[in-house]
Amino acid sequence: MFLLHEYDIFWAFLIISSVIPILAFLISGVLAPISEGPEKLSSYESGIEPMGDAWLQFRIRYYMFALVFVVFDVETVFLYPWAMSFDVLGVPVFIEALIFVLILIVGSVYAWRKGALEWS
């Protein structure tokens, strides 16, 4: 039988962890001094007047490199618990993890051939 009272601690932590950041933003918005002017609208470059436009457009290669990094980072997050409980789970879960890794290898080969891993 599914009992909700077993999750009281979870709900308490969820509520507390949601309320604290909201309160921090509200309190800082109320207590912070409001100072608007031309200095606030200019960008800060090491204490000197800005030279040129402050808005830069990054090349798409940086985003592709970051996206590939996130994919392999998520792979590590999924494979670590599997590796810690490998002896308990058995062969069927090993085959599933092997399929998961093979799909990621195919994806990395695809990204490599498309040039997403080249920095220059």
UniProtKB/Swiss-Prot annotation:
The chain crosses the membrane at residues 9-29, 64-84, 88-108. InterPro entries: NAD(P)H_OxRDtase_bac/plastid, NADH_UbQ/plastoQ_OxRdtase_su3, NDAH_ubi_oxred_su3_sf. It is a multi-pass membrane protein. It is found in: Plastid, Chloroplast thylakoid membrane. GO terms for molecular function: NADH dehydrogenase (ubiquinone) activity; quinone binding. Belongs to the complex I subunit 3 family. This is NAD(P)H-quinone oxidoreductase subunit 3, chloroplastic. It comes from Platanus occidentalis. The lineage of its organism: Eukaryota, Viridiplantae, Streptophyta, Embryophyta, Tracheophyta. The gene is ndhC.
